[in-house]
Amino acid sequence: IDAAIKELNYIPNANARSLKSKQTYTIGLVIPDIVMYSSICYYIESQLYENGYNVIICNTNFDHIRENKSLNSLLERRVDGLILATSGQNEQLIKRFEKSGIPVVLFDRMQPTLKGNYILEKHEQCIVTMTEYLIENNHKNIAYIKGPKSSYVSEFRFGKFKEILKKNSID
């Protein structure tokens, strides 16, 4: 059999194998910006590869419609897991992953209404440290450029920023 496999250059069908094993050995990684998340993509892909998994990277360009299409495509492909930095507007679709038994890990974004695992930076500590640094250095006209209102993290950071300014009597 081994000689025939070698002679015919036989390549096993991954789809057929996944039907039997009930695993695709594929993880979906959905990110809003490939440039901003390139390092994280590299490390996630490297770790998954070392553990026998392939990664489908979906770059949504901060477009919730594109994110929706990417999530649907990953569901159709029966990925074994989903790692996601969500726009925050596809909650029902993400819940479909959970209902299907597909593990979901959300990173860099918080969706308080979703169960699951989160990997988050210390958003509160970061915004407090940055804002207090500016205030301690006597800056009074501090501008804040924030992300979309649909982003829980963006709104959380902005709320903390305003709270610190108010506490320091800065308009």
Predicted regions and their residues:
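N-terminal helix-turn-helix DNA-binding module of bacterial transcription factors
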Residues: I1-Y25
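Bacterial carbohydrate/catabolite-sensing allosteric modules
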Residues: K6-N9, Y43-I56, K69-R78, E91, ...
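Short beta->alpha connector loops
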Residues: Y10, D33-M36, N61-H64, A85-N90
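Functionally critical, cavity-lining and gating residues within the transmembrane helices
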Residues: P12, Y37, F158
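Short, composition-biased local secondary-structure segments
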Residues: N13-N15, C41, T60-I65
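Conserved beta-strand edge residues that scaffold enzyme active sites
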Residues: L19, D33, F62, G88, ...
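Short beta-strand segments enriched in small/hydrophobic residues
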Residues: L19-I40, Y133, N141-P148
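Intrinsically disordered, low-complexity polar regions and short flexible loop motifs
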Residues: L82
